[in-house]
Amino acid sequence: VNELPSQGKSNGFLEGLIELFAGFEDYRSPYAPTIQPPEELLKELVQNASFKSGLISATCSLPPGPLGILSILPELLMVYRIQGHLIMDIAALYGKEVQVTKELLLYCLFKHGGAHVFRKIIEESSFKILIRPTTVRVFQTVLEKLGIMISKSIIRKQFARWVPIGGAVVTGTFAYYDTKRVGNTAMELFSKEIHSDEIREMLESQ
């Protein structure tokens, strides 16, 4: 019964997520690269973003029943906006803000729950990240797979909305740790060398 409404909501959410990417292109991090990225500052950024995400998620989960359900998509978009800015700030501290693509943003946001979705476009090793060029169709396929993941998340949140206080604690805690995982993924990713497939082919041909 919940699948069809949730699928519709996830489609609307994906449209909102794509709009967020346009906003991220205009976002300029206030942080500048250093010779060695300051570990304390990175941890502070992740911690602050995690608390902010948790607070927003918990607050949006307080209204009970149908009113609370209406707040699910705005909540998700606000949390992903916080996480997206966190990714950009971490990239800036590593001096790699200009290398952030929509593929890398999605990878940081969803790797901990769906690394397999990115198998065709991102290859990660211990020391480097390789980004393969994507067609519109490939990127659309990735979004469709993420849509399934998001639908499951929306269904869980729907149940939580019927238990206002307990549900708020659960969703707030989940958003907190989810943002921490996103931050840790971004720190691990941007500490590596980032290459595109075109660059690799050029180097191999020399």
Over which residues does each language-model region extend?
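Terminal, membrane-proximal amphipathic helices
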Residues: 1-62, 81-206
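Selective recognition of hydrophobic, aromatic-rich stretches within alpha-helical transmembrane segments
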Residues: 69-78, 174
